[in-house]
């Protein structure tokens, strides 16, 4: 699976009483599907995944799969503390035709990986390798400031044939460059469209379906009855592309520098409230218009810094830009009055 371009980490909408608001989630996804984003990250860190039950997790995964455009790459954030529970959700995501799963450090090991104990690192490696061995979907590793996968571990895991890449919200451009340099020998073939965009599982399914055409009885003769005739299905034209280990940059402040370091795309939390503005950084870089790319990057920074201070801030920024944000689920809190006023001012220049 090709991980290139902008991938939007979704927020999770709730009703005022804390229940999931699935209609608003579906509406957000439909709107994101009309943006230039290449994919959607469901229940990443900004989606409040640890505050959902497994049943709610399934409801969210199902709603997104039913609402997203077939061309959107879908990545399911399904990390659980046990391998067994994670694989159960991986199987569910596979049944919904997701394209990959997002898996990070289990909470049992948070804060211990960088200690002097080799046992904790061994447990992490066993956890991630076992999931990659048994998952029906490819794995994207997840690392951020609170749950950092060590670079050495990332490089070792990159060789696994079922691990596609890394979404890292904390890696500096120099660290991304180091990871890619140390994994440069890894080469894989992926299926892409004729214009080198990702071919998703749901695109393959859609290509196998076509609406029936009604053939009248009159056209068939007096003794015939009307029938539905399925027209030939237009083929999904594809080609192959050779790729290496793929990195999605999760740090909004360093999208451009991360792309320059070799990242294949971006998946920053701020994209949930300003997908067009984030995409414009990637587009200008892709067109090699470096002055424009730097200008687009600079205009993101102040608003992103405040919006990414917590799910409540990010959701309010979504509200300001035409997406449903709403309140976070307790114990998380909405932004203060002063934060709301500051976000209103900062988001003015980033309206879609």
Where are these regions (language model features)?
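Generic alpha-helical structural context detector
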Residues: 8, 283, 315-319
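Catalytic alpha/beta core domains of metabolic enzymes, predominantly
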Residues: 130-134, 145-299, 304-307
